[in-house]
Structure formats: structure tokens, C-alpha cells
């Protein structure tokens, strides 16, 4: 339920309060999601204060996606441009995406990079990670692992899960920094705690193998389960294997093969054979289904 004091301020035309209520309707936070109401309130913010920078990324997204209003890519770009001129990091990020993909504008990679860089400088972590990727791959910029890693570090310092994950990879591979496996392990676990499914998988692997940490099968199972909850294919397979073997968890072949089959359905190549055999032979209580086995 929305805070009554906030609603009262919004009714009194407090611009910040109107913006907060609009965001609540936009994402369904404390109130049922309502894109039409959100767009109406975002538009009211613009009418009351045209120099309110943060509103333009939301207005732009509404126009771009047709949320609460008719889709209009030109109006979306216009909104992003207005916000970018007011130093909105989000608007620079969405302008970068627009130029990268040619959405509402003529595709222009260099303009995309320009806006990603400005957004990163203004604190947008998605843009920091994107610039890191570009410098690591030499995509539109000269390849430079040191600069790439610095962008990842900046995102990591803001507790961005992907930034922490990419910084962990840099330390593990020695890209732009001296190789440091224990440091990468610490960072992977931090990223895992922040919810990054890839980091949860690698943290599980680290605890299973003792790579950079003391072996702990229970912790491995814990992190594989966290990643499996996000449908990470390989983590789901690993969790199934642990249940089949009783490693880090109480042995439960039924649960184990269920995870294996789920992993196969998610695309984990290691799971295909065992899932196929299960259906072919009718193992673990599953009926014989040779058609599924062949799939």
C-alpha cells in the first residue's frame, strides 16, 4: 500500500512525490502495476518541472515500449535526448541503446559508445559494464584490458552484481590485472550474494573443487541451488548430480534426476545423456518414453 503522506504530498503537487508515486505504479511497488496511471503522472511531473531529469528515461521507455501510451519511437528518442541534456545517466544509456540498435534513430555505433561513456561517467553501472565489454573485445574502441577492468571495477564499487562478476573474471584470467585466483574467488562469492546466477554457479564450482577456497560440498550445493532457482542450466545439472550421489545433500535419486531432466530442458549438454537414458529405460520412476529419449 502506498504511503499516505507520500500520496498527500503528490496531491499537493510536490514534484518529487508525484514522481515516486508514478514509479510505484510503473513497477507495481505497493500498488497494482498500472502503466497508464504511471505515464499520466510522469507527464504531470514534466508539466510541473520540465527540468526534472530522472523522469525522462521513464517517459522515453513508455513511448518506446507502448506502456501506458501509444508506441512512438521518435517521442521516445526526444524524451531521452531531453533527459540527456539534463545529465540523466539513464537517458544517456537508453540513447546509447537506441543508436546501437537503430531504434528511432539511424544506427550509429560511435554515437552509442559516446552515450555509453557519458552514462558511465554519470554513474550508470550497466554502461560501465558495457564499456568494459567493449574495451575487452575491442568492439568500437581500441582493445585495452586495463581500461576494461577499470570500468568493471567502477561498477563493482557500486555493488553491481555483473560488475563484480566481470571483475572476478578479470582477476581469474589475469586480464588487465595480475592474475589472482583467491581474489577472483572472493569477488565471485560477493557477486553470488548479490544475485548473479553465473557467479552463483562458479562459486558452487569453487566450493566443490576447492579452487581458491576450502572444499565444502554443502556450500557448493547451496550455491548451485541458488543458481538453479534462476534456471541456470549447468548449475541445475550439478545440483542434480549432487542429489544422485548424495554429495553435500542427502541422497535423493528422484530429486536428482528431476533436476537432471530440468537441466536438459534448459539446454545443459551434460544432462542430455542421463536424461535420455532415464526416458529410454524408464528409470527413477519415469515411464519409458523413447520419443523423449531420442530428443
Q: Residues of each region from the PLM?
A:
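Helix-turn-helix repeat elements of alpha-solenoid scaffolds
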Residues: 1, 33-36, 71-73, 108-109, ...
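N-terminal segments that cap or nucleate solenoid repeat domains
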Residues: 1-29
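Hydrophobic face of amphipathic alpha-helices that form TPR/SEL1-like repeat modules
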Residues: 20-27, 41, 58-65, 94-101, ...
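Short helix-capping/linker turns of helical repeat alpha-solenoids
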Residues: 12-14, 27-29, 34, 48-51, ...
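TPR/TPR-like (Sel1-like) alpha-helical repeat modules
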Residues: 288-295
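Canonical positions in the second alpha-helix
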Residues: 9, 45, 82-83, 118-119, ...
Amino acid at each position: 500500500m502506498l504511503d499516505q503522506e507520500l500520496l498527500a504530498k503528490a496531491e499537493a503537487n510536490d514534484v518529487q512525490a508525484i514522481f515516486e508515486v508514478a514509479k510505484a505504479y510503473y513497477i507495481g511497488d505497493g500498488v497494482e502495476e498500472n502503466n497508464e496511471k504511471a505515464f499520466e503522472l510522469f507527464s504531470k511531473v514534466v508539466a510541473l518541472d520540465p527540468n526534472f531529469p530522472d523522469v525522462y528515461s521513464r517517459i522515453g521507455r513508455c513511448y518506446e515500449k507502448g506502456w501506458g501510451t501509444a508506441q512512438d519511437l521518435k517521442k521516445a528518442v526526444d524524451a531521452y535526448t531531453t533527459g540527456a541534456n539534463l545529465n540523466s545517466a539513464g537517458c544517456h544509456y537508453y540513447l546509447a541503446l537506441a543508436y546501437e540498435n537503430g531504434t528511432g534513430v539511424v544506427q550509429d555505433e560511435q554515437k552509442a559508445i559516446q552515450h555509453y561513456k557519458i552514462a558511465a561517467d554519470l554513474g550508470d553501472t550497466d554502461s560501465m559494464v558495457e564499456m568494459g565489454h567493449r574495451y575487452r573485445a575491442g568492439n568500437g574502441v581500441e582493445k585495452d584490458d586495463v581500461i576494461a577492468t577499470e570500468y568493471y571495477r567502477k561498477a563493482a564499487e557500486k555493488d553491481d552484481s555483473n560488475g563484480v562478476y566481470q571483475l572476478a573474471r578479470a582477476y581469474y584470467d589475469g586480464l588487465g590485472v595480475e592474475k589472482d585466483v583467491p581474489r577472483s574467488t572472493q569477488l565471485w562469492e560477493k557477486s553470488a550474494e548479490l544475485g548473479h546466477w553465473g557467479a552463483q554457479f562458479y562459486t558452487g564450482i569453487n566450493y566443490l573443487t576447492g579452487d581458491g577456497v576450502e572444499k565444502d560440498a554443502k556450500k557448493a550445493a547451496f550455491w548451485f541451488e541458488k543458481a538453479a532457482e534462476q534456471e541456470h542450466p549447468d548449475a541445475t545439472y550439478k545440483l542434480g548430480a549432487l542429489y544422485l550421489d548424495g554429495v553435500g545433500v542427502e541422497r535423493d535419486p528422484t530429486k536428482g534426476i528431476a533436476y537432471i531432466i530440468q537441466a536438459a530442458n534448459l539446454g545443459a549438454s551434460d544432462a542430455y545423456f542421463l536424461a535420455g537414458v532415464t526416458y529410454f529405460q524408464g528409470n527413477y520412476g519415469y515411464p519409458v518414453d523413447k520419443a523423449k529419449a531420442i530428443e
